[in-house]
Amino acid sequence: MNENLFASFIAPTILGLPAAVLIILFPPLLIPTSKYLINNRLITTQQWLIKLTSKQMMTMHNTKGRTWSLMLVSLIIFIATTNLLGLLPHSFTPTTQLSMNLAMAIPLWAGTVIMGFRSKIKNALAHFLPQGTPTPLIPMLVIIETISLLIQPMALAVRLTANITAGHLLMHLIGSATLAMSTINLPSTLIIFTILILLTILEIAVALIQAYVFTLLVSLYLHDNT
């Protein structure tokens, strides 16, 4: 049972080669561009969502921070598309892998921190010691603030991994219960199947919300350092 339960989180291989690279490259192919296609409802909706997301993310930033607009919009589209594709049956979700989420979180976090130290080093150092701190607490507070800064990318990655993994496990368990009850009690099967449908709708919302939260936190880190 445990092996079957966690089998969907094992990175698949094709001819002995990891298929994760192909899976990661697949989501951008689902986003059409108006350069080659005539504008239709899909492209219009896509452009509207991109503009809305860009406006929400970039309102708080100055001119230097807005140079990240393309990266942040690309990030939220990539994570959202990857999460949604992972909800398909017999598919693999790369965002359930902590290693991949760390590979996204660490460079983005490091980029914002480096930008802060390069452009506003005094303000960046001031975050480690808030104004008015009592003298005896200064050494400990500097250590605490340093640790809180260093765990930011880990918090980003763990939050995304935990939420997506928990949803997939719950869907797997309820789906297995639906199949098991189908030969025992039909009314109970219908009730469990209804719960599964509602949970699937909830997981679609979670997939989109987690993409937004991940990108929003990166945007906030950028705002603090520009």
Swiss-Prot record:
The chain crosses the membrane at residues 6-26, 68-88, 97-117, 138-158, 164-184, 189-209. The keyword Cytoplasm does not apply. It catalyses: H(+)(in) = H(+)(out). GO terms for cellular component: mitochondrial inner membrane; mitochondrion; proton-transporting ATP synthase complex. Gene3D superfamilies: ATP synthase, F0 complex, subunit A (1.20.120.220). It comes from the Eukaryota. SUPFAM superfamilies: F1F0 ATP synthase subunit A (SSF81336). Keywords: ATP synthesis, Cardiomyopathy, CF(0), Disease variant, Hydrogen ion transport, Ion transport, Leber hereditary optic neuropathy, Leigh syndrome, Membrane, Mitochondrion, Mitochondrion inner membrane, Neuropathy, Primary mitochondrial disease, Retinitis pigmentosa, Transmembrane, Transmembrane helix, Transport. It is a multi-pass membrane protein. It is found in: Mitochondrion inner membrane. GO terms for biological process: proton motive force-driven ATP synthesis; proton motive force-driven mitochondrial ATP synthesis; proton transmembrane transport; response to hyperoxia. GO terms for molecular function: proton channel activity. PANTHER family: ATP SYNTHASE SUBUNIT A. It is linked to Neuropathy, ataxia, and retinitis pigmentosa: A syndrome characterized by variable combination of developmental delay, psychomotor retardation, hearing loss, optic atrophy and retinitis pigmentosa, dementia, seizures, ataxia, proximal neurogenic muscle weakness, and sensory neuropathy. Subunit a, of the mitochondrial membrane ATP synthase complex (F(1)F(0) ATP synthase or Complex V) that produces ATP from ADP in the presence of a proton gradient across the membrane which is generated by electron transport complexes of the respiratory chain. ATP synthase complex consist of a soluble F(1) head domain - the catalytic core - and a membrane F(1) domain - the membrane proton channel. These two domains are linked by a central stalk rotating inside the F(1) region and a stationary peripheral stalk. Component of the ATP synthase complex composed at least of ATP5F1A/subunit alpha, ATP5F1B/subunit beta, ATP5MC1/subunit c (homooctomer), MT-ATP6/subunit a, MT-ATP8/subunit 8, ATP5ME/subunit e, ATP5MF/subunit f, ATP5MG/subunit g, ATP5MK/subunit k, ATP5MJ/subunit j, ATP5F1C/subunit gamma, ATP5F1D/subunit delta, ATP5F1E/subunit epsilon, ATP5PF/subunit F6, ATP5PB/subunit b, ATP5PD/subunit d, ATP5PO/subunit OSCP. This is ATP synthase F(0) complex subunit a.
